[in-house]
Amino acid sequence: MKKKTYQNVKRGYWNGKWYDSSWELALIVYCHEHGIELTRNTKKYPYKWYNHIEYYQPDFILEDGTFLEVKGINDYRAKRKVSSIPFPIKVMTYKEMKPYLEYMTLKYGKDWRDRF
């Protein structure tokens, strides 16, 4: 099965933290500006996919140990990955990300993605 790739995705570092999308950037900026400790996760967890083992790496960890996964599309495979984590995990779909995206637009303007 071919992996999906997305063009024009914003990636890079902000304030020493790596982000893989503008949604992740919005979350990082919000947490930084509100004193919420957010750490990039580096651990991978195995999950079974079509009779072989794949590895899943959630995006972030909060200081209470909760994993955060920023996910634009929460399809079957994404749900399968998330279910492989033996720890609390919160999937941040558009509904959960909307307040952070609105925060960025209100504070930095509609073009905030281009300005960071």
Predicted feature locations:
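Electrostatic, structured charged patches in enzyme active sites and in nucleic-acid/phosphate-binding
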Residues: 1-116
